[in-house]
């Protein structure tokens, strides 16, 4: 039991849990004889209680017995059913409602785990998708073990005491270390997946870096602080000293869940023109809004001591599964719609300056410009009068040969003379810090690209396309070495038309002269014709 939720004074309120002197004049019916009884002179009665709370049998035998209950027992029963708490007897906290809520969460978690393992796929987000599947499997396994232990405990209490109590189920959340460890690992992985989802919502590399650093730090801090009190209950004697930590960590988790829900809902509002066009996408969007709001909603309801108080761990696991899996599916479908719209648009997709590592777009543009400049200068030096359109063609060999980075190092200018000076200690320290920062950013970008996905400008081919190309090459016989495909093309030169016009002019001149000229013209025509052929 968490002391920050319930104070000890609320539990000591039932008089039937204390011994009561009934006095004399009581007849007790013998269990083996129907029409016999024993007269008792002095009787002390005390109800069966567990942790200073009476245990009642939820059956229909209350009014069927001809004997009445004691006044203290009746008063305690009326008080018991008015307590809206997990130690009370209200209908919300009856054993039937608790079992129904636990099994419902178990069914939802297993269903979403199956969907995550079968339906959701993505080669660009392979690492984070594997983490999501592992987290879903851990959550399903944890709830399976939890329900098994609950049923065994209820069976034991039914056989020993003849009653089943919802109160005993609540102790499993904090006393069972298997549930605590698996819940800690599943929650940690789900929050890492939520960090990956938020990273996918943004396009700039700098924004992804900031989200990665802040999200990982907040996730690790919140989960480590959350798991300290359950472990302290089993390792230290002063277990009540750590209970003061839980309300602050609970508020911390509420803030993280609210931030995640706010970011997702804001992105949904920004993309309303896409998902509003399709009915199925609209229903999935409404479901996404509902599930991302359930997590902070259940946190607040658990703190406010409503029906799910002390059942929050089961509901939190289900909320983490739904808010992660359904949001991931919605984001995948939204990306498909965005790619279709960008393909039909004139502008296409946006390209940011820092989208590629090491400024690949800028370097490629510099290489192309340098190669074109060198090609034009070489053509001008060899033949200044021959201007052809082929001089503007830039082949890959020329681009790869002339690289401005091979001649001018990064960070140096051609108009400045550099010496091998070590500089001051401040400059060296700043240089070392800058180098360390660049390395950290580099590894961060590698983690983000490999786990969350590639950048927008990277052209990645899927496996199916490669398989189809390999099949076509095999059918054509191109998989063998030394085999190529050539395409025929008709080429017309401008010099052919000029030669034909010159030949016609010479024929006209030869027909005007005499027979001697005719012989010469025929020889000339023949030689010209042969030369033309």
From Swiss-Prot:
Q: Where is this region: Disordered?
A: 452-473, 494-533
Q: Which InterPro entries match?
A: PalH (IPR014844)
The record's subcellular locations are: Cell membrane
Provide the membrane-side ranges marked Extracellular in the record: 1-94, 149-178, 231-247, 302-307
Q: Does the keyword Transmembrane apply?
A: yes
**All ranges on the Cytoplasmic side of the membrane:** 116-127, 200-209, 269-280, 329-533
Q: Which UniProt keywords apply?
A: Cell membrane, Membrane, Phosphoprotein, Transmembrane, Transmembrane helix
Name the residue ranges with Acidic residues bias.
Answer: 495-513
Q: What spans are recorded as compositionally biased (Polar residues)?
A: 516-527
Q: Which GO terms describe its cellular component?
A: endoplasmic reticulum; plasma membrane
Q: Which residues pair up as cystines?
A: none
Q: Which residues does this entry mark as bearing Phosphoserine?
A: 409
| Membrane-related topology note | Multi-pass membrane protein
Q: Which residue ranges traverse the bilayer? A: 95-115, 128-148, 179-199, 210-230, 248-268, 281-301, 308-328
Q: Where is the signal peptide?
A: none
Q: Origin, by domain of life?
A: Eukaryota
Q: Which GO terms describe its biological process?
A: ascospore formation; cellular response to alkaline pH; cellular response to pH; fungal-type cell wall biogenesis; invasive growth in response to glucose limitation; regulation of vacuole organization
What this protein is reported to do is described as: Required for the proteolytic cleavage of the transcription factor RIM101 in response to alkaline ambient pH. Required for growth at alkaline pH.
User: Can you tell me which family this protein belongs to?
Assistant: Belongs to the palH/RIM21 family.
Mind telling me what this protein is named? pH-response regulator protein palH/RIM21
Q: Name the gene behind this protein.
A: RIM21
